[in-house]
Amino acid sequence: WESLTLLMSNFVEPLLQQGFRVVAFDAPGHGHSDTQATDVVDFSRALAHVIRHVGEAYGIVAHSCGGAATTLMLENNPDITPTNVVLVAPMPSLQKHVEVFQELAALPGHVFARFIEGLERRLGMSILEVDAASAAQHVKAKGLIIHDLDDSLIPHSAGYWIAKNWQDSSFVTTTGLGHLNI
């Protein structure tokens, strides 16, 4: 994975100035974490662990795969109840994500099928069950979903569908920022 906590640093200072405590971590397989590989389910478990370790979270800000991990974590951990959640360019589902990976890596169909089989074995579930838009239906926090029209990695419509399924959320569209500069 390309991302690390440092890329989210622009959010930190304004939150600190408003009196919030900010906790940031490199998810498994990201940045300076000890693991080399991860998946969105592992990411969601790590997020729940961090929140339980540091205490109640007033809000969560997550980008890309972290957005999917956050919605899955909130769906599967009803005892974790942040007031606000911001998802920036969120990944919609594991299925869509691996389809993008297949396209970028130009994997032949039979190789991709074996990749999916291995991934599902690792997860212990079908990739169809890992769906942020569906999980968003169960999130009680107030949500803000932000997605750029020019995101070349995750389509703008992904953020739209997550927001549409999230009862108490707003959707904001940006233009010209892509996936990483948003």
Question: Which residues make up each language-model segment?
Answer:
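Conserved alpha/beta-hydrolase
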Residues: 5, 12-34
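Alpha/beta-hydrolase active-site loop
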Residues: 35-58
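Gly/Ala-rich beta-loop-alpha elbow adjacent to hydrolase catalytic centers
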Residues: 61-70
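Hydrolase active-site cap/lid region
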Residues: 75-125
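Active-site nucleophile elbow and catalytic-triad environment of alpha/beta-hydrolase enzymes
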Residues: 118-136, 141
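Short alpha-helix in the alpha/beta-hydrolase fold that links the catalytic acid
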Residues: 132, 141, 155-164
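Short beta-strand/loop motif that positions the catalytic acidic residue
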Residues: 138-140, 145-147, 151
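Catalytic histidine-centered segment of alpha/beta-hydrolase-like enzymes
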Residues: 177-182
